[in-house]
């Protein structure tokens, strides 16, 4: 036996101790300090043969060697092979078996795992190793923990016995999974756990006999982490999602949601991507025997598909249905929201060519209101459009045609078939500073209205079974773009964009035609220059009018838009073409429409404003207004908003039989919304809306959230106005009815389940309140 004192020994061994030569790659988490180079993920690049021939360097205080048998290193032993390292109190190399054993305060790092162990055994020939009584941390994926025994059975494949795993940073054991066996495949980024139990602060919460879970950011089949919540409405809730990576182009998420006061709801979300046929998703939700809903089963499903085939065919499907009208009021759903009044059920296919296109549409609705005013079913509608230039870019010809079948089960309304053909000539002229477009169209429509069995006698006497209508339309619109450098504010460019439009549509009696799919459009500034007042063709409003207005914009030296002000009005040559359903309009009206004004402002990218006003000169009052001011700062924002609509404007634009059940005085609502992130862990958000007409709260929400590197908890209180007693809004003795809800949400972060990286804005966007946070700022930036 030979003895060596403190000696640096370099030995080129024909077989290597560890995995192939690697290349360092940074893998830094913002939540922790950057690890030393030896603690960073190393991506394997060389093959097994190279690994077996990589030299190993050993440094130790002492060496005892028996030729042909073993070499024993002791005292501050350090074994390295490139970037890979073992340190220990003693290391023994068994030469006959090519096995290395390290004992006593062992640290190990192979570029994929770093560990502290009592003992490490390495089989040089097989390039495998085992660790005993170990604390470990993966370097290429999230995950750390402890294990009584760890074995590497293949490249990037690890087997743990009596171990634990968590994504929490070192020193934080807020949660962990403890299992009798854990199989980790870092290449596949999955962990398979045998008899795992989930622990929070070392307290077991639940147990399953078997589970797999992803440990990276790629799509892998396995359980995602559960979330816990408590709400005053549904009690304790536990949500457990499972992700199934069926194929590269298909996947599904299955979620079990236990609600203490309702039962267990099962949700499915299947997504697919086809080769050449488009993409889509299928969603399903089922709750058997809802304890708070007469023990009835409740369900919902949604089918969506969007596809473009061979660049010419377009296929769209959007079909949703739920079991009852209270579904979204009672249950959180990915199919719809609590403010939804209807669900669309539509299929659409279209073919496009260079000069023509054709489409077929089928549409129905599920109404979610107790007082149904059900839209017509479209069974079906065929559109055929043709376009061709006649004289270069200066004269175009087009034809729009449509055949529609309207169907309803309401015996008080007729079924109908509508045929519409609309040829038109358009003459567009433009240069760098102006545009001028003139068009003439002929609107030809035929109706076949089925009045048989119509129970509304007055309506039956008013309508005709066969109606033919031909209405010409003429429109010319011009706009000029002027620009100058401002003299009173240096570095800014101002534009002036006046526009003028004349529109003529002769008057036609259309009282013998029922309204099937037509609504009055909002007349804001941009609506002044439309050619139609209605969205459909059942009502073609007569017009003999001149629209005029202008916009001015201010751009800074980076040509970023900072201010935009627009204003305009319509002059009616024939006062009879002014549309009004309101009985409050005075007999002596002017020939002018309301003034429409829009304004947007952006000061230094932290103060934003948007406002809009419609001022009725006949009533000498403001009919509609909205205003939003938002201040943004580091970590948050605060927004104030106001909306105002007179009852007269509502009566003028919407025909409602029971308007008093909705509002007595119109709309006058003020709101404030704010959110702030105190630091990387704490954030808060809130919103409050008040009805100034009825002097009552509309809704408010307050939320406080804490988020660490591996878990989060949120507290939310919401209060929402549902209605008034007996629908008597603001009446003496009638009080508002509210829904109050307090909730606590708890969830796990890590292993590809970072459900909320938790900005305060996202908290507001994800709230269940009817009035969502919005940013109505329209400057071109």
From Swiss-Prot:
Location within or outside the cell: Cell outer membrane
Annotated Gene3D superfamilies: Lipopolysaccharide (LPS) transport protein A like domain (2.60.450.10)
UniProt keywords, alphabetically: Cell outer membrane, Membrane, Signal
This protein's record includes keyword Nucleotide-binding: no
Membrane as UniProt keyword: yes
Cellular component terms per the entry's GO annotation: cell outer membrane; transporter complex
Entry-linked Pfam families: LptD, LptD_N
Family according to the record: Belongs to the LptD family.
Stated role: Together with LptE, is involved in the assembly of lipopolysaccharide (LPS) at the surface of the outer membrane.
HAMAP family per the UniProt record, alphabetical: LPS_assembly_LptD
Name of this chain's protein: LPS-assembly protein LptD
Gene responsible for this protein: lptD
């Amino acid at each position: 036996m030979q003895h060596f004192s403190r000696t640096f020994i370099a030995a080129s061994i024909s077989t290597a101790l560890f995995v192939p030569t690697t290349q360092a790659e940074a893998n830094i988490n913002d939540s922790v300090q950057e690890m030393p180079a030896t603690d960073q993920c190393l991506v394997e690049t060389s093959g097994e043969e190279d690994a077996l021939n990589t030299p190993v360097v050993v440094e130790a205080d002492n060496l005892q060697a028996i030729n042909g048998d073993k070499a024993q290193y002791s005292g501050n032993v350090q074994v390295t092979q490139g970037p890979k390292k073992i340190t220990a109190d003693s290391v023994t190399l068994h030469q006959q078996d090519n096995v290395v054993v390290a004992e006593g305060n062992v640290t190990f790092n192979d570029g994929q795992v770093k560990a502290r162990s009592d003992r490490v055994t390495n089989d040089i020939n097989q390039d495998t190793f085992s660790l005993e009584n170990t604390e470990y941390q993966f370097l290429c994926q999230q995950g750390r923990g402890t294990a009584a025994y760890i074995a590497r059975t293949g490249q990037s494949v690890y087997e743990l016995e009596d171990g634990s795993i968590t994504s929490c940073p070192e020193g934080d054991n807020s949660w962990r999974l403890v299992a009798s066996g854990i199989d980790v495949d870092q290449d596949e980024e999955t962990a398979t756990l045998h008899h795992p139990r989930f622990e929070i602060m070392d307290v077991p919460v639940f147990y399953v006999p078997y589970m797999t879970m992803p440990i990276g950011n790629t799509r892998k089949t396995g359980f995602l982490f559960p979330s816990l919540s408590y709400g005053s409405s549904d009690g304790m809730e536990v949500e457990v999602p499972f992700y199934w990576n069926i194929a590269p182009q298909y996947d599904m998420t299955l979620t079990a949601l236990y609600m203490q006061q309702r039962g267990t709801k099962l949700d499915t979300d299947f997504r697919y991507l086809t080769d050449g046929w488009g993409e889509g998703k299928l969603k399903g939700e089922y709750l058997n025997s809802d304890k708070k809903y007469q023990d009835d089963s409740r369900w919902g499903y949604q089918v969506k598909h969007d596809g473009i085939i061979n660049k010419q065919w377009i296929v769209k499907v959007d079909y949703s249905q739920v079991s009852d009208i209270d579904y979204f009021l009672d249950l959180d759903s990915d199919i719809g929201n609590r403010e939804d009044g209807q669900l669309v059920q539509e299929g659409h296919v279209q073919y496009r060519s260079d000069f023509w296109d054709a489409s077929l549409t089928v549409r129905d609705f599920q109404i979610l209101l107790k007082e149904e005013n059900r839209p017509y079913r479209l069974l079906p509608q065929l559109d055929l459009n043709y376009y061709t230039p006649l004289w270069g870019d200066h004269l175009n010809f087009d034809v729009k045609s449509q055949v529609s079948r309207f169907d309803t089960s309401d015996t008080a309304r007729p079924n109908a078939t509508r045929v519409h053909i609309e040829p038109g000539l358009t003459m567009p002229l433009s240069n760098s500073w102006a545009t001028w477009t003139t068009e003439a169209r002929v609107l030809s429509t035929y109706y076949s209205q089925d009045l048989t069995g119509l129970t509304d006698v007055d309506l039956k006497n008013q309508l005709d079974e066969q109606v033919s209508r031909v209405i010409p339309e003429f429109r010319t619109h011009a706009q000029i773009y002027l620009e100058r450098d401002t003299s009173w504010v240096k570095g800014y460019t101002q534009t002036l964009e006046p526009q003028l439009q004349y529109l003529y549509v002769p008057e036609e009696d259309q009282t013998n035609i029922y309204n099937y799919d037509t609504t009055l459009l909002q007349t804001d500034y941009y609506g002044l220059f439309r050619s139609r007042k209605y969205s459909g063709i059942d009502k073609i409003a007569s017009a003999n009018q001149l629209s005029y207005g202008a916009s001015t914009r201010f751009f800074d030296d980076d040509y970023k838009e900072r201010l935009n002000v627009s204003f305009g009005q319509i002059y009616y040559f024939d006062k009879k073409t002014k549309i009004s359903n309101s009985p409050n309009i005075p007999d002596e009206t002017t020939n002018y429409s309301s003034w429409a004004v829009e304004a947007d402002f952006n000061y230094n990218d932290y103060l934003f404003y948007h406002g809009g006003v419609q001022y009725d000169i006949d009533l000498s009052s403001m009919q509609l207004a909205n205003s939003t001011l938002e201040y943004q700062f580091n970590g948050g924002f605060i927004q104030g908003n106001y909306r105002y609509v007179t009852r007269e404007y509502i009566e003028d634009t919407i025909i409602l039989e029971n308007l008093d059940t909705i509002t007595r005085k119109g709309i006058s609502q003020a709101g404030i919304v704010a959110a702030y992130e105190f630091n990387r862990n704490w954030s808060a958000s809130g919103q409050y809306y008040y009805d100034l007409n009825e002097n009552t709260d509309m809704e408010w929400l307050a939320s406080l959230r804490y988020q660490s590197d591996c878990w989060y908890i949120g507290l939310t209180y919401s209060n929402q106005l549902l209605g008034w007693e007996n629908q008597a809004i603001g009446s003496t003795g009638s009080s508002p009815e509210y829904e109050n809800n307090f909730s606590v949400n708890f969830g796990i972060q890590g292993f590809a389940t970072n459900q909320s990286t938790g900005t305060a804005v996202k908290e507001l966007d994800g709230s269940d309140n009817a009035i969502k946070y919005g940013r109505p700022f329209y400057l071109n930036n």
